[in-house]
């Protein structure tokens, strides 16, 4: 009886808080501006440039060099883009795509699979989708005035996120194979 009343509560309903789309080019310059145009065409808002945190000499990346573009989408537009992205993945994800916080992410190889026309001058870019799930009422933890805590039972868990994905998007979740532990032997 208590479980039924909890399920019927509209505040317990899981919603998409935001969708973050990232295209990492790995270098600044012309390829990055073309990736920015692709993301702007997809999201219909201006993307933000991301900078490298560290210098990696093997990849030829310097610290604070612009290497990626990302965009955060909310509301109905986020749900539409998520639907397009999941269509490309055929509504199939692996269990390790889901985080313990109830969020999940996946990547696609070609942006033209989302319905954008191919332009030879632009090229083809892959992108990462990261979906943050939450419940209504979580704003109380982030507001400026009368800030308070969100209870542990109100947080979205990994299992709840997986059930939500299977129910709302009729998705299929594959169980990830357990990795074998490698036994390293010392040479003597």
UniProtKB/Swiss-Prot annotation:
One of its GO terms (cellular component) is cytosolic large ribosomal subunit. Component of the large ribosomal subunit. Belongs to the universal ribosomal protein uL5 family. Transmembrane segments: none annotated. PROSITE patterns: RIBOSOMAL_L5. Keywords: Cytoplasm, Nucleus, Ribonucleoprotein, Ribosomal protein, RNA-binding, rRNA-binding. GO terms for molecular function: RNA binding; rRNA binding; structural constituent of ribosome. One of its GO terms (biological process) is translation. Signal peptide: none annotated. Component of the ribosome, a large ribonucleoprotein complex responsible for the synthesis of proteins in the cell. The small ribosomal subunit (SSU) binds messenger RNAs (mRNAs) and translates the encoded message by selecting cognate aminoacyl-transfer RNA (tRNA) molecules. The large subunit (LSU) contains the ribosomal catalytic site termed the peptidyl transferase center (PTC), which catalyzes the formation of peptide bonds, thereby polymerizing the amino acids delivered by tRNAs into a polypeptide chain. It is found in: Nucleus; Cytoplasm. Its main location: nucleus. This is Large ribosomal subunit protein uL5. It comes from the Eukaryota. The lineage of its organism: Eukaryota, Discoba, Euglenozoa, Kinetoplastea, Metakinetoplastina.
């Amino acid at each position: 009886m208590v479980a039924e009343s909890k399920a019927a509560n509209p505040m317990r309903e899981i919603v998409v808080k935001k969708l973050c789309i990232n295209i990492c080019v790995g270098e600044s310059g012309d390829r990055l501006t073309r990736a920015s145009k692709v993301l702007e065409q997809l999201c219909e808002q201006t993307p933000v440039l991301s900078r490298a945190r560290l210098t990696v000499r093997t990849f030829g990346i310097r610290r604070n060099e612009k290497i990626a573009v990302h965009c955060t989408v909310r509301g109905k537009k986020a749900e539409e883009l998520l639907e397009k992205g999941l269509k490309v993945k055929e509504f199939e994800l692996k269990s390790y795509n889901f985080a313990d916080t109830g969020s999940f992410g996946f990547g696609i190889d070609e942006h033209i699979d989302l319905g954008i026309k191919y332009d030879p001058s632009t090229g083809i870019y892959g992108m990462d989708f990261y979906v943050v799930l939450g419940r209504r009422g979580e704003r109380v933890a982030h507001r400026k005035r009368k800030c308070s805590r969100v209870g542990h039972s109100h947080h979205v868990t990994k299992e709840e996120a997986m059930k939500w994905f299977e129910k709302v998007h009729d998705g299929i979740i594959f169980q990830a194979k357990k990795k074998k532990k490698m036994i390293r032997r010392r040479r003597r």
